[in-house]
Design a protein with these regions (language model features):
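Rossmann-fold NAD(P)H-dependent dehydrogenase/reductase core
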Residues: 2-239, 317-323
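Pocket-edge positions in alpha/beta enzyme catalytic cores
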Residues: 49, 78, 252, 299-302
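Short coil/turn segments at secondary-structure junctions
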Residues: 120, 124, 181-185, 248-251, ...
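C-terminal helical subdomain
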Residues: 190, 244-295, 302-308, 312
Length: 323
């Protein structure tokens, strides 16, 4: 197996030219999303920085262009916690009539202390991390199909999961955490759902035939990266003790944002990434590490019956059909 196929030794220097490709990244104003967007633009892609806050998006774009004046990027407004916003954005994007080569479902909400709701009344983590991205992917599929009909590099949907999925469970009787809310429990459920979505999307794309079968579904996780999500989330007692015990030094135990972005970049651009693949850092417990490789998958993420049920739930809750 070559380095390109395994991810071992793969770096940003191995990214193929992205000239002519159009990429959309949600949550691109900071953290992993920003670094993935910057690398895509640096390698020639036209990047859409999908942000819910225009000021933060503009600041990210200015930062990107200060580092690389040639970067082709623009800020687009998208709030995944509002299906109305998702519909409006997707309608405007499809009206352009241009292909979309890459969709990175990166934005996320992590473990708010109190149960919060989206504009549509969903628990905010499930509503944003899962339902918002499900609806966005469904609505943008025609643009991805356009790219699939005539591609040099196959169009891809990359969905960000997490090592937290390993301890996640889908509670179909209370997906919105109305009866009982645990900040990290709801987060783990959302990340398990994201990974199951990526796998089920892969199966359905390949079963659909051309041109849609030309679209790849890939997943990635950043390990434990020192991003805004990690800094503001509510953690379980063990995680709290670790943070308190290590204090500032905990930063040395985590992936930087740049390191955390590597699995996403591999999933999005490496020729060695495969249909239905799931990639993460290869250090201790996949929490950190420079090399990228296939990530461990919890048994519950491979439950096809549960994945099909989750799919139906997502279609019902969003009012959007997908494959």
């Amino acid at each position: 197996m070559t380095n390109e196929e395994s991810g071992k030794g793969w770096t940003v220097a191995d990214i193929p030219s992205q000239v002519g490709r159009r990429a959309l990244i949600t949550g691109a104003n900071s953290g992993i999303g920003y670094y993935a967007a910057a690398e895509l633009a640096h390698n020639g892609a036209h990047v859409l920085l999908a942000c819910r806050d225009k000021a933060k998006g503009d600041a990210a774009l200015a930062r990107m262009r200060a580092k690389d004046p040639r970067a082709k990027a623009e800020v687009v407004l998208l709030d995944l916690a509002s299906l109305e916003s998702v519909r409006a954005f997707a309608a405007a994007e499809l009206a352009l009539g241009v292909p979309l080569d890459l969709l990175i479902n990166n934005a996320g909400v992590m473990a708010p202390k109190k149960r919060l709701e989206t504009a549509d009344g969903f628990e905010i983590q499930f509503g944003t991390n899962v339902l918002g991205h499900f609806a966005l992917t469904a609505m943008l599929l025609p643009a991805l199909e356009r790219a699939a009909a005539n591609y040099s590099q196959r169009p891809r949907v990359v969905t960000l999961a997490s090592i937290a999925h390993k301890s996640g469970q889908l509670n179909f009787d209370d997906l919105q955490s109305v009866k009982s809310y645990s900040p990290m429990g709801a987060y783990r459920q959302s990340k398990l759902a994201d990974l199951m979505f990526a796998f089920e999307l892969d199966r359905r794309l390949r079963a659909a035939g051309t041109p849609v079968s030309g679209v790849m579904s890939v997943a990635a996780h950043p390990g434990v990266a020192n991003t805004n999500l990690f800094q503001v989330g509510e953690f379980n007692p063990i995680e709290k003790m670790v943070r308190k015990g290590f204090g500032v030094a905990i930063g040395t135990l985590l992936n930087t944002e740049e390191q955390g972005a590597m699995p996403t970049l591999f999933a999005a651009m490496a020729s060695g990434a495969t249909d239905g693949g799931y990639y993460g850092p290869q250090g201790f417990q996949e929490m950190r590490g420079g090399d990228v490789g296939p990530a461990a998958v919890a048994p519950q993420a491979l439950d096809r019956r549960a994945a099909a049920r989750l799919w139906r739930e997502c279609e019902s809750l969003t009012g959007v059909s997908l494959l």
